[in-house]
């Protein structure tokens, strides 16, 4: 049974991010610079939602001179990191929140036909009756809000530790964001 009480929302986004040194500003422009991108868009798992949207974008925007390359998130990030170090042009699939937006300055390419759906949300949901059964928990969840940058900061710390110490990194986040955390408490 899916809980039916939405109690908070966080901003999220998916699309095609790029480094600011890449002078392309919109997805349709990619076809004009396909050679600079080695005729590739680097993606993740072929069945991921963002990959389906990227295949749609290739069709809708006529990006037939670009090939969507699937792989793991790790392989996509490795290729992206290597290209950034070499100051090469690269285009990848991306989403917020993700630690790469904290690690590197990135911009989403404009999506004039809204293939990726524009701004999205991450929702916190609770089971029916939680407000009556556990009012403090409900109140905490109701006011719990953090920015994509705050989420990404925690994610980059966890990633830097190769996911070995998420609890310690959560404590680090709490220590460095005391006023934010206190604003969530009943």
Please provide the spans of the model-predicted regions.
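A conserved helix-loop-strand patch within extracytoplasmic ligand-binding domains
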Residues: 1-43
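Extracellular/periplasmic catalytic domains that process cell-envelope and extracellular macromolecules
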Residues: 4-7, 34-36, 85-86, 117, ...
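A bilobed periplasmic-binding-protein/Venus flytrap-type ligand-binding module shared by bacterial periplasmic
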Residues: 9-20, 120-133
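Short amphipathic alpha-helical coupling segments at ligand-binding clamshell hinges
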Residues: 26, 132-144
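Solvent-exposed, polar/charged alpha-helical surfaces in well-ordered, non-transmembrane soluble domains
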Residues: 28, 32, 52-56, 78, ...
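Ligand-binding pocket segment of bilobal, Venus flytrap-like solute-binding proteins
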Residues: 44-112
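Domain-level detector of nuclease and nuclease-like folds
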Residues: 76-77, 125-127, 135, 140
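C-terminal functional modules
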Residues: 144-186
